[in-house]
Amino acid sequence: MEANLSFPQSAFNFPVSLSEKYRPHRIVEFVGLEKPKKILERFAASPYPSAWIFYGNSGVGKTSMALAEEIGAEPHHIPSQKCNAANIEEVIRMCHYLPMAPGRLLLVLVDEADAMTPAAQLALLSKLDSTAFPPSTVFIFTANSLDGLECRFLSRTRQVEFSSYGMASAIAGLLRQIWQSEGGKAEETPDMERISKNSRNNVGDALMTLETELRAA
């Protein structure tokens, strides 16, 4: 299934990279990922304070979907290396002092949560189950795998798998759309299936290769 995208006009001018230019901002714009999209669409229709883990291969779209417009939350992005047992209180204080629009949720996004130490996970878990964070907080942790996460941490969160299985054809379709939108000549169209396969279903890597092809055309 190809993404429902509206592309800006271009002619081989790349003031920003293709991966940035075509980064999806709405749930419907993501390539593949039908199950995560359905889950997030339901959540966006009636959001509530909760904790989630988005897990799957690097580059599949976990962080971008967490920031989708439909979620309607004020995002606060925390790299996992800053989320350790020693500074959990500092993270909590920052969340309380962030500017918040009335009625909006606060999104605390922790990337690469599987890199957190067990002590950091349990320290954060103790705060998730208390009133430490603002009551309107949504936590989304991204991870390449669940293997490095504590069982107690997993039991407190809802896991959503971002599987790249079967995405190769969808990525190839996206690349063809972008090639045409960027003014690539039909007779010079590269093998999009090959690019998709070589990227191992990493959309960002596929777009980097496509950008190289466009510059060489």
Question: Where do the protein language model's features map onto the residues?
Answer:
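P-loop/Walker A NTP-binding region and its immediately flanking N-terminal helices
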Residues: 1-170, 174-180, 187-197, 205-214
